[in-house]
Amino acid sequence: MIPKLPLSAFIICLNEEAYLGKCIESLERCAEIVIVDSGSTDGTAALVQSYIDAGWPIRFMYEPWRGYAGQKQFALEQCSQPWCFNIDADERLDKALRELLPELLAASDEIVGWRVARRPYLIGYGYTPENVRERRNLRLIRRGKGRYDLSQKVHEGIVPEGNVGNARTGSLLHFRPLVMDEQILKENKYSTLKADQQVESGKRPRFYKLIFTPPIYFLRLYFRNGLWRCGLSGFIEAMTGAVYAFLTAAKIYQRHALKARPNVDDALSH
């Protein structure tokens, strides 16, 4: 029996039967696994129950959808261990990160959390190599030392109450190979959430952002982050990021334009 660590992993999910099993199996050292489902209609519940029946320390519960940040905050509040780790259903800890966990949890009191590297799976290539840099995300937090910003509709993250460090090795492996048809639907959804969030916070459209942000986004991902190392698959990934940046900026502009100008029917009535 592998000794358990004082760690709660928390996962939000909806119809994740195809991915959740691998995620759970990478959390074998966690003393607790909290899974919050928002109404799955596939075999997610049966899959989770099979792990519970096999003795996994899983707490499975239903909670109506609160938005990404709200749902993760609810899941975080259910955790009972001294440390809490957020992981998505389509992610799993690689071997190096699993082996590093005891060291991270033994950090001095001044460290309240850890940022972790993430390596996505690219169709036609595989997982990006470790020298391809993706922004590290704060995933590991001491219980009671961080909360989600509920104003964030997408790309939500934990706001820590103290110092955080970067895990020196190991990665979260992100496996959800979406073909371009599916990827565009995802980018459209996320850019809508981001644009709505920006407009609600008072963000105004900027001409230069609409023109320059998409190519700058591509160049940053492809050259600075190193996606050029992944061949054509890396090019597609970087270009998809640029599309997301363009859609977000364009939607911010159009939302403001519709508020500032009368619609066609109003103009014709005068």
Curated annotation (Swiss-Prot):
SUPFAM superfamilies from the UniProt entry: Nucleotide-diphospho-sugar transferases
Family assignment from sequence similarity: Belongs to the glycosyltransferase 2 family. WaaE/KdtX subfamily.
GO terms, biological process: lipopolysaccharide core region biosynthetic process
Gene that specifies this protein: lpsC
InterPro entries from the UniProt entry: Glyco_trans_2-like, Nucleotide-diphossugar_trans
Name of this protein: Lipopolysaccharide core biosynthesis glycosyltransferase LpsC
EC number: 2.4.-.-
Pathway: Bacterial outer membrane biogenesis; LPS core biosynthesis
Origin species: Rhizobium meliloti (strain 1021) (Ensifer meliloti)
EC supergroup of this enzyme: transferase
Keywords on record: Glycosyltransferase, Lipopolysaccharide biosynthesis, Transferase
Single GO molecular function: glycosyltransferase activity
Cross-referenced Pfam families: Glycos_transf_2
